[in-house]
């Protein structure tokens, strides 16, 4: 076990540097390394260097994962961690990336569980090999059973319920919930939470890997469903595409969202979007890597076997201005 300098470690834990570290959207199975020399802050701990793999279901071009990665890289910088980041939206290929991390004998694995059935066997292999596993972002209901010692993220069902209650309060009767990745348990839970409060909710599946297709599918749905009174995107880039379709079709439908980026924050300020629920992805990346480090240097298990919630937090016109600066820095 790595030697732990308690005084320096405690100081490091007390300060979370808000850095906008450079990152690009990752997908397609590409693995990229970042470590203690990334970013501009000085190294904060003197513990032995460890290697942590973060493997997400990121699709190429989805900027949500840039924010997750920035949080992870900030924690890696602080904790003297070599971070190996990779992602693939297809469950089988994501499982292959986890297997590669096991073969590399990494010191810890952070993994998203959007497709838990595809990942359950390989996550068990990691745990059986003595590699601590933290799950993040998706699959909170399956996390513990699959062997992760904690999970960082929001409850997608609770986030959906939050949106559903807000829509119900506004008198919405027939919202359209747009799922950009079929089979993603977290996205399905979001729509289920909305439907729990607004029974007239309708599901629309789109191909999130092709924004042109998203736009045309949404436009066609708006034109064929004139009684729909709200449409909900399940991620900031998709909601912004929905906004364009609404404007192009001349629809008066209300738009709501999940997640946040700088452009969506501005859209809320100018009332193109009513509100969003933010799951604070920077915290997901940061907390997950930090939890692995804490496990390695002190045997600490963050969360007590339970999920560590990072959301949902409602952002609407009343508070969008407060978060815009952070969103523009790529932190929210």
Predicted regions and their residues:
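Bacterial N-terminal signal peptides that target proteins for export
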Residues: 2-13
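Hinge/cleft segment of the Venus flytrap/periplasmic-binding protein
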Residues: 11-14, 37, 41-44, 48, ...
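C-terminal motif of bacterial Sec signal peptides marking the signal peptidase cleavage site
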Residues: 20-23
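Extracytoplasmic "Venus flytrap"
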Residues: 39-75, 79, 84-96, 104, ...
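Short, solvent-exposed amphipathic alpha-helices that sit
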Residues: 63-79, 159-163, 185-201, 217, ...
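Hydrophobic alpha-helical segments within soluble ligand-binding/sensing domains
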Residues: 94, 150-175, 213-215, 261-264, ...
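Hydrophobic alpha-helical
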Residues: 95, 111-127, 208-266
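Flexible loop/hinge segments that line or gate small-molecule binding clefts
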Residues: 117-158, 259-269, 273-274, 324-325
